[in-house]
Amino acid sequence: MKRRRRGARGAAAAALALTMVTACSSAPAGESSTTAGAASTETITTGLDAPWSVAFHGGTPLVSERDSARILELDTAGSAREVGSIGGTAGGGEGGLLGIAVQDGFLYSYATAGEENRIERRELTRSTGSLGLGLPEVILTGIEAAPIHNGGRIAFGPDGLLYATTGDAGNRGSAQDTTSLSGKILRMTADGAVPEDNPLPGSLVYSYGHRNPQGIAWDAEGTLYSSEFGQNTWDELNVITAGGNYGWPEVEGIAGRNGFIDPVQQWKPVDASPSGIAVSGESVFISNLRGERLREVPLADPRTSTEYLTGEHGRLRDVVSTPDGSLWALTNNTDGRGGPGPDDDRILRVDLGR
């Protein structure tokens, strides 16, 4: 496998992550520097039911709905059509049909099936406007499920491998247990096999010590970022390194302790509860549920941020950079914890005026 050269921004982020794991003598830091920014929105589609993830099949947007387990495709006018459903999904609480990803004509899904979360793939059949789903093929089973902390974000990295975030499912100790799939970021081939260069031989575990990570994205230099729900003290943005230990449940937020990698940015949960993230241009964008805002973190200075749309559209579950370079945000007010409006839930095109 070819290795990507790391540019200045990726090197800066990696250096900051290394600083966070080695500088353990300093006192824990507080919240990062934040400013308010202005943005406008345009509605792409309405009437979604507890939507969780957006992915693209070519230029066609696909949306997952957590509770109905449906996959929807959107046409150019924003009208939604059901492609199919992910059979066997049995959620409850935070479980259900969660993340989706598309690769080589297949839809990959992460869904709760009773006592476990599983990753499956199905061929996307027919053409845009009449897409269907083929038979399921199981990629990975045995990820512990619970009414809380299921993780659930999946994405293909620039190395062509599939990454998945898993929560601790309320079993705190599992996050530090490298034989468990819970509380991890996993890395696998498209068939679910262990890549030869994974940091732990014979293991899908790429990083560990996570509580409930729900966002993963890469910058142009191949640096991996992840957002994570903390408990009561700090939510996090992390730069992920292979084999890294991110501390949960021993630490939360920037603790400065030996052996644990600190986040590059942290926020109080009331202002955050970060879910899906996307890299667009020179920034990481983070959707926030409880915080009801879109947060921008510049790659060149990941200890600062700008906040948009605060309180304007309610809970935000996902943010994606579209094939044409637009930025979309997915609201999540029908998930049982929000106050849905008459058109919820929606996908919004976000314009930062640049």
Label each residue range with its predicted role.
Residues 122-131, 186-195, 240-248, 252, ...:
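Short loop/turn segments immediately following beta-strands, especially the blade-tip
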Residues 306-312:
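Short, Gly/Ser/Thr-enriched beta-strand-loop segments that form substrate-interacting elements
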